[in-house]
A protein has these predicted regions:
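Non-cytosolic beta-sandwich-type ligand-binding/adhesion modules
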Residues: 3-17, 27-28, 32, 39, ...
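Loop/turn-rich, solvent-exposed surfaces of beta-rich toroidal or solenoidal domains
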Residues: 345-366, 383-422, 488, 494
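Blade-level signature of beta-propeller repeat domains, shared across WD40, Kelch, NHL, RCC1
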Residues: 441-478
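N-terminal beta-propeller domains
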Residues: 3-188, 199, 204, 208-220, ...
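Repeated scaffold domains used in trafficking and secretory/extracellular systems
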Residues: 138-155, 190-203, 230-246, 287-304, ...
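Beta-rich globular "head" domains
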Residues: 251, 489-500, 601-611, 617
Length: 667
C-alpha cells in the first residue's frame, strides 16, 4: 500500500538507505521486502496496465551504406553478411580477408594458399600444367644438377649437367629436346671430377671444376672439351660462372696454404677453343673483390642497368656489390650496394629488364629496384622458405624461383608477378609447377625460347619440363579467413559458387573448428551460380569462416579442366544479445513493502531519485537485483524518467511519484 499523504515521521520509522554515500552496490534483502535493487538502491515495482514492465532485445545490428566505387556486398540486403571474391590474380599469402594491415582493395584479390592452381588470369582460377622428368629418364642424377637453355641449329634444347664426380661411362652433359630425346655431349671419360659451375653464352658451354675452367663449342660438328684456365696452384672450393654484359665472369673461392682467398674475374676467351690453358693467377681480379672477410664465398653474378652485381657471404654475413664498366667497357672496382640482414645470406641473383634484381637468400626471395646510378633498394621478403633459393628465371611480367620441398613437401617453382607492387612493399606470388615426389634443391631453371615451356633441375633427381598442354590432375585453393574484422561469433549459412560450364569437377570444402568438411561436388558439364548450405560443416557458431576448392582435370582430356570464377560466403553474426529492461519504480516518502511493513522518511523520495540519477550520471555498470524473479545482472542505465503523482500538502513538499528506468544489460 502506497501512503500518498505525508505526515510527520514516527520515531519507529528508520532510514533504510544511507543516501549520504553507499559502501556497496549490493542490497541485503533480509531487512525489507523490496521488489528490486539498482546499484544497492531498493525499490518497489508499480506494475499495472499504465506502467508495465518491459523487456526487449537491444538493437545489435546497424544499417550500413556501401560507399565504395562499385556496388558491393553490403549494398544488397539479404539479411546475411557476405564476403565474396571474383578474382584471385594478386596471389597467395594472406591469412585474413579483412584488412588488418594493408590495402583492402588488394586483399580482395588474394587468398591464403594453393597448390596446382593458376590464379593469374583475372576473374578465374584454373589448373597449372603438369610436369615430367625428361632426363635421366630411367634413373636419377646422383647429386647437383644444372640445367641451361640452348638453341643449336635452330632447335631448342636443355643442357642437362650432372655435377657429381662420375666414372668414364657416365653422361656428364646431355642435350635434351622437349620430347625427351637426349644426346650425350660429354662423358665421364672426358671429365670425371665434380663440376662446380656451368654457364653458356649462346654458343659455348663453360664448365668449372676445382682445378680448371673449360669451354665447349656447342655449334661445332665435332666439339671437344678444352681446358682454358687452370685455377692457380690451389684447388677451388667454390666457383660461380655467369655471362653478363657480354663477358664471362667468375667468382672463385680457394685456399692458398691455410689462407682462404676469394676473387671475381673477367675471363677473356679469345683465341678459340683450342691451345694451352692459362693460369688464373695471371688474370687480374676485379678491384676490391679480394678484400672480403676470411671464408668469403661468391654466390652469384647478375647484370642490371649500368652495372654487374656480385653477391657473397661468410658465416652469417652477406652483401651485394656492383661493378660498373666505364665508357671503354673496362670494369671498375667493386662497390658495396647492399648489406643483407645478419643471419640471412644471399645465394642467388637474377637481373631482369635492367630494372629488377631478384635476390635469393637463405630465407626466401627479395626483389630490388635498380636506380639510374646502378644502386639498388630491396624490399622485404616476398615469401619465406626454410631452404635457400638457388636459381631464377623470368618471362613476360613474371620472375620464377626454385624452391626446395616447398610445395606440399615437393620441390618446384614459385611465380612472382612484377606488374603490381603491393602496399607492404612486396609483389604478388603463388606456387607454380612442381616435381611431384622430389625433395631436393632446385639448382637451376629456365625456358625453352620458342615454346615458353619452363624447365628446372632437382638435386639428386634430374631435369623436369612443364608439359606443353596437359594439366595437373588436381589443384586446391584455400581462401583467407573471413571474420569481417570482429571476434563475435557467426552462424555460417551458405556459400555461393559461380562457374561456367565445367570441364572438370570441383569439390567445395569448409574449414571449421571441427576440421575440414566437404560441402558438395560440382560436376562436369554443368554451370553454377548456386548457393550451398554450410550448416553441416559449422555445427556451432564460430568466429572464423574459411573455404577450400579442389579443381579436377577432365577425365577424358588431360588438356582441359575445371575453371572457377568466384565465390561468396554468407553468415549472420551471433553476438550475445543484450536486453533493454524498463521498470516502473515507486518513489514516495512513505511506502509499505511486500510484507506490509511501513517504512520511509520525510523527503526520502527526492533523496532516492537524486541518488539514482547520480548512479546514472556516473555511467558505471550497476548491479540489478530482481527479488521477484531471483535474477541478478549487470546493466547500464540508459534513461530515467520521473512522473510526480502527489501534490504538495500543507507545509509538506509531499514529493513522490513513479520512476520509469530503462537499462541495458551488459553481456
Amino acid at each position: 500500500v502506497v501512503l500518498k499523504q505525508s505526515k510527520s515521521p514516527d520515531i519507529t520509522e528508520t532510514v533504510i538507505v544511507d543516501l549520504t554515500g553507499r559502501s556497496s552496490q549490493y542490497y541485503d534483502p533480509n531487512t525489507y521486502a523490496f521488489d528490486v535493487a539498482i546499484g544497492g538502491l531498493p525499490f518497489l515495482l508499480n506494475v499495472n496496465d499504465t506502467t508495465p514492465y518491459r523487456r526487449s532485445t537491444a538493437r545489435w545490428k546497424y544499417e550500413r551504406v556501401d560507399q565504395a566505387r562499385e556496388p558491393g556486398e553490403q549494398t544488397l540486403d539479404s539479411g546475411l553478411w557476405v564476403r565474396s571474391q571474383t578474382s584471385f590474380h594478386l596471389g597467395e599469402g594472406v591469412q585474413y580477408q579483412e584488412a588488418l594491415e594493408g590495402n583492402a582493395e588488394q586483399l580482395r584479390f588474394r587468398y591464403f594458399t594453393g597448390q596446382g592452381i593458376d590464379p593469374w588470369t583475372p576473374g578465374q582460377i584454373s589448373l597449372l600444367k603438369d610436369t615430367s622428368k625428361i632426363f635421366p629418364a630411367a634413373t636419377s642424377s646422383s647429386g647437383r644438377v644444372i640445367s641451361l637453355p640452348a638453341t643449336i641449329s635452330g632447335v631448342d634444347y636443355v643442357l642437362h649437367i650432372d655435377c657429381a664426380a662420375a666414372g668414364s661411362t657416365a653422361v656428364r652433359v646431355a642435350r635434351v629436346a622437349a620430347d625427351g630425346t637426349a644426346t650425350s655431349l660429354i662423358l665421364g671419360s672426358a671429365l670425371s671430377t665434380e663440376i662446380l659451375a656451368a654457364e653458356t653464352d649462346g654458343t659455348t658451354l663453360y664448365l668449372a671444376t676445382a682445378t680448371y675452367i673449360y669451354d665447349y663449342d656447342l655449334t661445332a660438328a665435332s666439339p671437344t672439351l678444352h681446358a682454358h684456365y687452370q685455377i692457380n696452384t690451389a684447388n677451388a672450393t667454390s666457383v660461380v660462372l655467369q655471362f653478363v654484359k657480354n663477358r664471362i665472369m667468375a667468382g672463385v673461392s680457394y685456399v692458398t696454404g691455410t689462407t682462404p682467398v676469394a676473387a671475381v674475374y673477367e675471363l677473356p676467351f679469345a683465341g678459340g677453343h683450342g691451345g694451352s690453358h692459362t693460369n688464373l693467377s695471371t688474370i687480374t681480379s676485379v678491384a676490391n673483390t679480394t678484400t672480403v672477410p676470411v671464408g668469403w664465398i661468391w654466390s652469384d653474378i647478375a647484370e642490371g642497368r649500368g652495372a654487374i652485381y656480385v653477391s657473397g657471404y661468410a658465416g652469417d654475413k652477406s652483401a651485394i656489390f656492383k661493378i660498373a664498366p666505364d665508357s671503354t667497357g673496362a670494369l671498375g672496382a667493386a662497390v658495396s650496394v647492399a648489406d643483407i640482414p645478419r643471419g640471412e645470406t644471399v645465394r642467388s641473383l637474377f637481373g631482369y629488364l635492367g630494372t629488377y634484381l631478384a635476390i635469393g637468400t637463405s630465407r626466401g626471395v627479395r626483389v630490388a629496384a635498380i636506380a639510374d646510378d646502378a644502386t639498388i633498394v630491396y624490399g622485404p621478403l616476398i615469401f619465406n622458405t626454410t631452404n635457400p633459393i638457388l636459381g631464377f628465371a623470368a618471362r613476360d611480367s613474371y620472375i620464377y624461383a626454385g624452391v626446395k620441398a616447398g610445395i606440399g613437401g615437393a620441390s618446384g617453382i614459385y611465380r612472382i608477378y612484377l606488374g603490381q607492387l603491393l602496399d607492404d612493399g612486396t609483389y604478388p606470388y603463388a606456387t607454380d609447377i612442381v616435381a611431384t615426389g622430389t625433395t631436393g634443391s632446385v639448382d637451376a631453371l629456365g625456358f625453352f625460347p620458342t615454346s615458353a615451356q619452363l624447365f628446372f633441375s632437382v638435386h639428386s633427381s634430374g631435369t623436369y619440363l612443364e608439359h606443353a598442354t596437359n594439366l595437373v590432375s588436381e589443384g586446391t585453393l584455400q581462401t583467407a579467413i573471413v571474420n569481417w574484422g570482429t571476434l563475435e561469433k557467426k552462424a555460417w549459412k551458405r556459400v555461393r559458387v559461380e562457374t561456367g560450364t565445367l570441364n572438370g569437377n570441383i569439390e567445395i570444402y569448409a574449414d571449421a573448428n571441427e576440421g575440414r568438411t566437404q560441402i558438395t561436388t560440382l560436376t562436369t558439364g554443368n554451370a553454377y551460380n548456386t548457393d550451398f548450405d554450410l550448416s553441416g560443416a559449422y555445427a556451432s557458431t564460430q568466429v572464423n569462416g574459411q573455404l577450400a576448392f579442389t579443381l579436377y582435370r577432365n577425365a577424358d582430356s588431360a588438356s582441359t579442366g575445371a575453371i572457377m570464377k568466384g565465390y561468396a560466403i554468407k553468415a549472420i553474426p551471433s553476438p550475445t544479445r543484450s536486453r533493454l529492461i524498463q521498470l516502473p519504480l515507486m518513489c514516495y516518502d512513505f511506502e509499505s513493502d511486500r510484507r506490509n511493513t511501513r517504512y520511509g522518511t520525510l523527503g526520502g523520495a527526492k533523496f532516492r531519485l537524486s541518488a539514482l540519477e547520480t548512479v546514472e550520471s556516473n555511467g558505471a555498470t550497476v548491479l540489478v537485483q530482481d527479488f521477484t524473479s531471483g535474477e541478478n545482472f549487470d546493466a547500464v542505465i540508459e534513461e530515467i524518467a520521473f512522473t510526480r503523482m502527489t501534490p504538495p500538502s500543507g507545509t509538506y513538499e509531499n514529493f513522490g511519484g513513479i520512476i520509469t528506468i530503462t537499462m541495458r544489460t551488459v553481456v
